[in-house]
Every structure is written in structure tokens, then in C-alpha cells.
Amino acid sequence: MHMSWDADPYTVDITEIEGFDDLHHAEGILKEAQERAARIYHADETHFLVNGSTVGILSAIAGVTNKGDQILVARNCHKSVYHAIYMNELNPVYLYPRFDSELQLNIEISAEDVRRALNRYPQIRAVMIVSPTYDGIVSDVAEIAKAAHEKGLPLIVDEAHGAHFGFHPYFPENANQKGADIVIHSVHKTLPAFTQTALLHMNGNLVNREKVRRYLHMLQSSSPSYILMAGIDQCMEMLDHHCEEVFDPYVERLKRCREELGKCEHIRLAETKHYDKSKLVLSVAGLTKGLADTYGAEATGIQLQEDLLNQYHLQMEMAAGTYVIAMTSVGDTDEGMKRLIKAIYELDKKYKP
């Protein structure tokens, strides 16, 4: 499946006509496209999603549990996880991420906590975590998968923000490579693909794959957009044949950007040992904004976000507490990163201890 980026969308907005396959019963070009995606992502089986990672998470959880089951859930999971728990009348057992008081960030889920919970609650039927988090925190998926598999349980990883993992050594391997049983990727978040496009991957023999497929059929649109699916396939084409030429210059730009931002005297890059370096988490923790109308009040992420938008026309991904997140991707340019560096340098003079 190929589509020119400058094509008129109305001319390619087809449906399941002869020769163009059917996403819900893929036997032709869509089957081939999904098999290629599986190969690229080191998965046993991959499905295109046109209703976002949300439909993948809903289908994954429904597919590995039955009504009334217990499920071990990281408390920092996406709201779709809680929607799945509600819809399937599950009983969640919560895993709380550790908190870094210096960074003012929730950090990773530990494998030790997973093992402790599984021993305490033997009725748990599946484990659900998010890695990387919105803030870029990466948990030890391999060790968590091992802990789940010791009990014969499947591990579902919401890796929506890690669709770029595994394509350059600067970033972690993806959760398929780490032993997860179901992995969900939002290709639109960190790769060049249309909004709401995603992938669901399945691995191993701990998952009832037919049950997951059944929920995908029920929960995903019966009229999937061929524009969105062609966009996914075009993204896979890039990863398959142009990975180095796309990722190598991006990583070099990102390294330079992080190095320059690291020179700031006050605003700092917040990161942990296990971190997705594509996320620029800019922290003003412990600082005040040196303006008369703030009366020395502690600076906030919201203030920094507003300054970047209103003064420099730079839109951040989000702001929370004492930090903002600037998301980067292979689509970023030298010019864009230089604008961010210049803005932060100037604001660094206004935010002080």
C-alpha cells in the first residue's frame, strides 16, 4: 500500500473493494503490510489500528481476562486502561511508580514490586504497565516480563510513546524485544504517521490471540480508513528501507540540543538512568520567576509553557507541576531545535533559585 503525501485524500478514500483487502479479514495487501510491520518490530503478529492505541489497549485487556478477574495495573496507566477495567468489570490491583523527589517526577515501576504483588495476590490474571511514560520514564520491561512469566501470566505494555524504540542504539529496544506478550504502539506520536494510527503486537503462547482479534473486530471501526492504513504502511516503508538515513541525523540533532540545554544555569533537563532521550523534560523545580508580580512564588511548568508559547511561539507537548515536556521526533529540524535552545537560554535568566 502506497500513497503520495500530496495526493488528494478524496481520491484515495476507498473502502473494501476488490483487490484492496479487508482489515478485519486480511488475506491480501493488508495481511502483507501487517506481516512486514511485525517483522520490523520483532513481533510474532501485528495488527494495524485506526482507532488509536486506545482500541489496542481495550482489546488487549479484554482478550486476556474474564469478567471479575484481577489485573495488576501500574497506577500511572492511560485512562483507556481504566475504561477497559470498567467495561470488563475487572478488579485492579495497583502498582505505584516510585517518586523522585529531586526531579519531582514519578519514575519507573520496579520488577521487585511486580513480584511482591503477584505473590500477595495469586488470583491476578495479567500484568499491565506503561513504558515509556508520558514523561519518558522507561521501566525494566525484560525483568517485569520475567516476573509475569514466572507465574504464567501475560504482560501487556502500553508503549504508545515508544514507537521509535529499537530503531537506533540511542533509544531503548522495544517491548517486543524485551519479552512482552502484547505491545501497543502509537505510530503517530513519535513517527511520521497520521493521528490515531497505531499498532498492536502479540508474542508467545500466553495470550489467547483469537480472543484479542475478536475484540479488535468488535471495538475497531468496521469502516477503517484506507488513508490511515496507507499512512501506517508508508511509515513502515520508511523504517524498513530508510531507517538509518532518517534516524542518524535526528539523533545527532537531538544530542546537540540536549548538550546545549544542559548548559543552562537554572532550568535543567530532568532525566533518570532509564529514560527516553527523545523527550526533553525541562524542569523549573526549586526556581522562582524573577518578576515583581510573582512575589517570589515557586515557578511552575504552566508558567514556563506559557512563556514559551506567548513569547517564542513554541508549543510544548504538556506542562505539569514544575516541568514541561518538549517532544521531539525524526520530523524535527535544526532550525526548530535552535529556536528552542535560544528561548530556554533567554528564559534561564528569568527563572532563578
Set out the residue ranges of the language-model regions.
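Short N-terminal amphipathic alpha-helices
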Residues: A33-Q34, D44-V50
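Conserved beta-strand termini and adjacent loop/short-helix elements that scaffold enzyme active sites
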Residues: L49-N51, L95, A319
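Short glycine-rich or small-residue beta-strand-to-loop segments that form or flank ligand, phosphate
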Residues: F20, H47-L49, V127-V130, I325-S329
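Conserved C-terminal alpha-helix-loop-beta "cap" of PLP-dependent enzymes
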Residues: R256-P353
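Generic structural marker for isolated residues within well-ordered, non-membrane alpha-helices
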Residues: Q34, P172, Q305
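Conserved PLP-enzyme active-site core in the AAT-like
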Residues: S4, D13, H25, I40-A43, ...
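Glycine-rich phosphate-binding segment of PLP-dependent enzymes
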Residues: M1-Y41
